[in-house]
């Protein structure tokens, strides 16, 4: 995959997300290597938990932790690692871990991909049980890994998500 050819934004309201980890997959953390374009196994998680949503990143962005902006894509189906999916950001999970701030953008597929998410415009439109599952996952997925921890500090709205995405794009443009 030539990541250099994939833009961060498809248009003003749509972001491109490169999937690293499919929803409900085994307890394996994959990471996309930007130089080779390959998906590597980062580690086998010690907890027997699976990601509640498809997990990936926005290309050509840089978050406060030095990695691309992370995204959880709410969908009905697992998406193959390395796939690019067009999404709309609807909110953000605010959290910290042993490396610092580590926010997760919450996004849904665009109408062209799946019209069943058209009603979700803001984080408040996302199912409460799914939000609880997301929080539970991130509060516990590192529990058995020595020296690792996560603290979920809350949820923020679409405006905050959009702001974090823009900041991530600007960091890369200044490099």
Swiss-Prot record:
Keywords: Cytoplasm, Hydrolase, Magnesium, Metal-binding. One of its GO terms (biological process) is phosphate-containing compound metabolic process. One of its GO terms (cellular component) is cytoplasm. It is an enzyme of class 3 (hydrolase). GO terms for molecular function: inorganic diphosphate phosphatase activity; magnesium ion binding. Its cofactor is Mg(2+). Substrate binds at residues 29, 43, 55, 141. It comes from the Bacteria. Mg(2+) 2 binds at residue 70. Mg(2+) 1 binds at residues 65, 70, 102. Its EC number is 3.6.1.1. It is found in: Cytoplasm. InterPro entries: Pyrophosphatase, Pyrophosphatase_sf. It catalyses: diphosphate + H2O = 2 phosphate + H(+). Pfam families: Pyrophosphatase (PF00719). Homohexamer. Catalyzes the hydrolysis of inorganic pyrophosphate (PPi) forming two phosphate ions. Belongs to the PPase family. This is Inorganic pyrophosphatase.
